[in-house]
Structure formats: structure tokens, C-alpha cells
């Protein structure tokens, strides 16, 4: 590619999926430019690495580019897309560019409705501990690396495979992981769950004959597609028929202690430095891959024990002063689907038994809120106190019956929790100051702008002091 394409421009370069690919390309020696609507830590990092960053979208931004990379979130009438089309510059989907990177190395693609980012991070961390020095492209910041992407010298590239727009069908890895299959992004599949499952089957057909599909058999939908996978399958999970499974699971001190059972291997005692049964499952995927690639048990144990997590995935901010003179534990999480939220809430209950759980939640997308409305009501009813914001639209038109206010009214009707509704994320710090008490565990959650709230909370407390 490099003898033809020397300058690559990214429209929306600050996004999690785009920025990782851009960083790897910068490190490969390409001239990289990009635009976004605002600056963030990611754009600052890319600029420091040598990328040219423009704030705002303008036709002039693509000057000199041999290719323009877009995600499905970029509209066709974006001025940079229009300019590229007018100038005859190839417009490349993000997943297609990721597929090009995978052609340079042996790809390990992590797919599934939930858990992709954490599982990708665990796989990258375990392979790195085993001396394989992988390249990785992750949808969140790997805290130990301080970045969501890295160009390694080894043979493997570990990346998330996105089913939300079916773009994972562009990838041709040698190892695939399927963590679970759940009803999300159903607009892509015509609201037909069978079509979604078929897409995952087609994903496994991208594997070479020597490749393998590493699948979580605890998920009933994954289990249903196994008979249709024509390539070698490695089953992991907590189920008795899993080839890589966890037994004797014990949650202590915010960590998960368990024994790994693998066919033909001695039992392996593991401590995972993060809470939650779902993260045990994610770790098993990493263990299965690492075992297959010859990583030593010592390296596996070390990587999991020292895993520092991923930004916005049960990310701990420590103890924060509360308005009553005490302090509460602050955690931030990216969860935005009821299944993910339930797993995070369960992890918090396990890590902090007996403590009151306060959730500040920003729903993400009106269509998801509409499609999962009852499930949102059920999962939000399980916390002890709730601050709820208006839906983060992510470019969608508002749906009045699926608004944050509508969700709030439905929760009050059920009667298990009385939500404090705020119109904007900017109102969350004040609302939490009134709700949070000494000894509470407070979780800010959502895939939208609520990710900036933890830093504001700390600042809010300092200003009040």
C-alpha cells in the first residue's frame, strides 16, 4: 500500500476506533491527517506523534491525501467526503483500513456484542507478557500503555471486530473470538435477530483453514451457531463442556480468584485484577489464545494479576469527598446496553458488598432506548439511587417515548428506585453532590459525554472546599 498511498486523512479522527488505526499508521511512517469537531486527549496525542489535526470539517483539510478514511458515523454530505469524491480520492471505510493492517500481520479479531474492548486488552496484555510484542488497536485506552493502539514488532495484531455496522465482515484474521451475541444495533440487520447471528457465522467463514474460532459457550446464542462454524472451534467459559473453563471462582478485594482447567494441562491458579464474573469469561478468552500460541503459564498469571484495566471499563477514580463530610468510591464505566450494565452492577456488588450503590446513567441512542426500554427499566431498578440524564442522541432524531424523562417516569411507576432526572450531563455533579453519601459506591455510566463527568466531579468537590 505504501508505494501508492503516502498520506491518509481520517474524518472523525478523535473517535476510539479511528484514532487507534491512525496511530498505528503514523508509527508505520505514513503521513496522517485528520479532523474532528473538538479536541480531546486522543487528538492531542496524535498531534504529538506527528499527525496534522484540524478542528471542524472543511474541504481544505484533505489537501494532499491519497485516501480518506471514514466510519459509518460520518455522513455522506460531510464536506471532506464531498471533496474527496469530487477529487477522485478513494474513500475507505474504517474496517477496510483495519483489514489492510491485518494483512501486514496475523490478525486476532475480537467480536461480540459486549466485552470486546476488555477482551482485546486482556489478549494484548497476555501476549505482551509472553514476549510476543503484539500490535493492538483497541476501542478504549489500555491504561498500562497509556494509549488505545500500539505498533509492536511481533507477528500478531489484536483488534476489535465491530458488528454494529457489519463491518467486521471485512476482516480476515487467523484467530477470532466471539464473546456473546445480543440484540443491539438491530437497525443494521433489519431488526431480524437471525440475520445478526448469520453475520457472526459469516464472520467465522473469513478464517483460513488453519485458523480457529474461540467462542464463549456460556452464551446461548453463541452456542446455537457453533454447529454452523466450519473451522476449528475452541470453547471457553464456565460451562462444563468448555475446553478452557474457570472453576473455584472467588471474588475478593475487587479481584477475581479462580482455577483454569484446560484439556491436557495442569490446573492453573489465576488472580484477575478486576471484578466481575463477565471479566472471568473475558480473561478465559485471552488464556485460550495465549495457551494456543505457546505463552507460558507464568506469563499468563503475571499479566492477569497486573492488568490495570481499560479507560472507562470499571475504571476506578478512588475515594472522593462527599457533601456530608465523608467519602464515596467513584467508578466510571462505558456500559450502555442493559446486559453490560447488569454485569457492571453485579461486579460492583461483588467488589463492594454491603455498600449503597448510586448510578449516574446517560442513555445512549434513542433507538437503543426504545428497543431495550423494559430491560433498561429492569436493570436501573436494581440500584439504590439513580441520577438519570437525557439520552445522548449520537446523531439520531429524538423519540419522545424513548427519552430520559420517559424512562424516568417508567422507573417511578415500577417504584423500586426514585430517579433524579437532569436534562444535561453538566447537571450531574450537582445532582450527585445531593445524592451521594459517605460509604457509597458511585458509578457514572454511558457511552456518550458522561465520560467527562468523573474529572468534573473531582473539580466540583475542590471548588466547594
From Swiss-Prot:
Q: Which residues cross the membrane?
A: none
Name the chain's protein. Answer: UDP-N-acetylmuramate--L-alanine ligase
Per the UniProt entry, what are the Gene Ontology biological process annotations, in alphabetical order? cell division; cell wall organization; peptidoglycan biosynthetic process; regulation of cell shape
The protein's annotated pathway: Cell wall biogenesis; peptidoglycan biosynthesis
Q: Which gene encodes it?
A: murC
* Described function: Cell wall formation.
Family matches, as PANTHER family:
UDP-N-ACETYLMURAMATE--L-ALANINE LIGASE, UDP-N-ACETYLMURAMATE--L-ALANINE LIGASE-RELATED
Taxonomically, the superkingdom here is Bacteria
Q: What is the lineage of its organism?
A: Bacteria, Pseudomonadati, Pseudomonadota, Betaproteobacteria, Burkholderiales
Please list the GO terms describing molecular function.
ATP binding; UDP-N-acetylmuramate-L-alanine ligase activity
GO cellular component, as recorded: cytoplasm
Q: Which NCBIfam families match?
A: murC (TIGR01082)
Amino acid at each position: 500500500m505504501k508505494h501508492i498511498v503516502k498520506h491518509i486523512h481520517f474524518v472523525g479522527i478523535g473517535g476510539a476506533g479511528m484514532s487507534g488505526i491512525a496511530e498505528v499508521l503514523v508509527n508505520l511512517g505514513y503521513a496522517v491527517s485528520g479532523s474532528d469537531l473538538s479536541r480531546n486527549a486522543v487528538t492531542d496525542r496524535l498531534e504529538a506523534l506527528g499527525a496534522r489535526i484540524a478542528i471542524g470539517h472543511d474541504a481544505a483539510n484533505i489537501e494532499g491525501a491519497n485516501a480518506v478514511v471514514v466510519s459509518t458515523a460520518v455522513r455522506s454530505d460531510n464536506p471532506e467526503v464531498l471533496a474527496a469524491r469530487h477529487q477522485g480520492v478513494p474513500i475507505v471505510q474504517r474496517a477496510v483500513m483495519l483489514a489492510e493492517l491485518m494483512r501486514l500481520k496475523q490478525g486476532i479479531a475480537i467480536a461480540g456484542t459486549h466485552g470486546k474492548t476488555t477482551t482485546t486488552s486482556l489478549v494484548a496484555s497476555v501476549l505482551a507478557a509472553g514476549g510476543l510484542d503484539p500490535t493492538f488497536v483497541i476501542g478504549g485506552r489500555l491504561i498500562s500503555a497509556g494509549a488505545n493502539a500500539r505498533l509492536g514488532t511481533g507477528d500478531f495484531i489484536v483488534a476489535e471486530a465491530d458488528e454494529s455496522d457489519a463491518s467486521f465482515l471485512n476482516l480476515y484474521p487467523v484467530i477470532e473470538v466471539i464473546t456473546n451475541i445480543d440484540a443491539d444495533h438491530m437497525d443494521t440487520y433489519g431488526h431480524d435477530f437471525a440475520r445478526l447471528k448469520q453475520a457472526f457465522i459469516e464472520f467465522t467463514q473469513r478464517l483460513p483453514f488453519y485458523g480457529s474460532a474461540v467462542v464463549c459457550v456460556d452464551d446461548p446464542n453463541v452456542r446455537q451457531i457453533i454447529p454452523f462454524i466450519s473451522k476449528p472451534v475452541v470453547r471457553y467459559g464456565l460451562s462444563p463442556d468448555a475446553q478452557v473453563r474457570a472453576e473455584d471462582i472467588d471474588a475478593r478485594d475487587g479481584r477475581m480468584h479462580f482455577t483454569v482447567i484446560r484439556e491436557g494441562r495442569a490446573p492453573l491458579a489465576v488472580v484477575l485484577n478486576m471484578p466481575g464474573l463477565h471479566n472471568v469469561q473475558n480473561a478465559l478468552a485471552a488464556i485460550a489464545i495465549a495457551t494456543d500460541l505457546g505463552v507460558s503459564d507464568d506469563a499468563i498469571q503475571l499479566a492477569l494479576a497486573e492488568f490495570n484495566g481499560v479507560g472507562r471499563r470499571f475504571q476506578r477514580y478512588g475515594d472522593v469527598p462527599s457533601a456530608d463530610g465523608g467519602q464515596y468510591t467513584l467508578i466510571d464505566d462505558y456500559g450502555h446496553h442493559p446486559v453490560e450494565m447488569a454485569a457492571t452492577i453485579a461486579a460492583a456488588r461483588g467488589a463492594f458488598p454491603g455498600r449503597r450503590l448510586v448510578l449516574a446513567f446517560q442513555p445512549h441512542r434513542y433507538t437503543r432506548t426504545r428497543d431495550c426500554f423494559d430491560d433498561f427499566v429492569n436493570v436501573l431498578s436494581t440500584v439504590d439511587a439513580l441520577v438519570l440524564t437525557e439520552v445522548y442522541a449520537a446523531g439520531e432524531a429524538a423519540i419522545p417515548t424513548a427519552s430520559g424523562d420517559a424512562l424516568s417516569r417508567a422507573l417511578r411507576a415500577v417504584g423500586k428506585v426514585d430517579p433524579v432526572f437532569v436534562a444535561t450531563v453538566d447537571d450531574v455533579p450537582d445532582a450527585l453532590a445531593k445524592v451521594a453519601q459517605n460509604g457509597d459506591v458511585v458509578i457514572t455510566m454511558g457511552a456518550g459525554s458522561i465520560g467527562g463527568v468523573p474529572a468534573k466531579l473531582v473539580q466540583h468537590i475542590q471548588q466547594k472546599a
